[in-house]
Amino acid sequence: YASYHHNIIAHCESRVPRLGPRYTTLALDKGELVDIRNNVYYNYAGEGCYGGEAQKVNLVNNYYKPGPATKLFTGSKEKRQYRIAKPDVYPKDYSGADYKKWLQTWGRFYVSGNCVEGYSDVTADNWQDGVFGQMDAKNCEGGESSALWKEHTSIKVNSPVSGAGHVTTHSAVDAYDMVLQYAGACNYRDKLDELIISDVRKGVATCTGSAKEWESLKGWSDNKPGYINKPSDIGTNAGQLDEKGFPVLATDTEICTEDTDSDGIPDYW
């Protein structure tokens, strides 16, 4: 069982998130159970959220906010702007021998309460365009005429595949506000954290790196808005970051760092 909640993923090319099964957990009595709720996804591109081959997944009350990179999708790919998830199957010729038992097998998905900013119809009905409309028969043996593809709507279940444990569930809109206010790996936010949160709130991409040095490679394309190659692509952000793109941290020179017993912890601690 895996739980992923109240996190933010911003300026990420793809795998937002990638629902990637593991054969050892697929083999458990109840299968691989994944609960994803109350997260915020901003300025995603590539494939966005996809996968879930043979998994059992809850996608509940997440907030999707297309950004400048997301909005570059046009034509047949425009639907990725309002993608909630693209469930799929492992192809018959998948190279992972340990996954043989689960090839050509749909997962089961409980999808409810997700909000896609700017797409009220998808917010109202997550399934029609946000999930079913994103799927294709590419990995189905026999394509669209196969029995496997004809049963692709069977991925939908009407009750959660698992409970949420001790997670408090909020509406997607409330989760958006809470995640932007509280999410993070520390109890305070540095200038880089603040920059990312500001981008999400404003719907912008402040920093974009250049991929020109790789333009001789096959399939090359320059970075989409908001995507960087290295920390220094962020710049100094008006002097709030150093030249390498990292926060400028204060140094306390008054603390004695003597460690008389050599246990790696200063005596004062």
Spell out what each predicted region is.
Residues V60, Y64-S262, P266-W269:
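Long, contiguous C-terminal flanking segments immediately downstream of a protein's structured core
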Residues G20, N39, C49-Y50, A85-D88, ...:
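Secretory-pathway low-complexity, repetitive Gly/Ala/Ser/Pro-rich segments with frequent Tyr
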Residues Y1-L19, T24-L26, K30-A45, K56-P68, ...:
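Right-handed parallel beta-helix
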Residues R15-V16, E47-C49, K71, Q81-R83:
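Structural detector of coil-to-beta-strand junctions
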Residues G46-E47, D267:
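Alpha-solenoid ARM/HEAT helical repeat scaffolds used for protein-protein interactions
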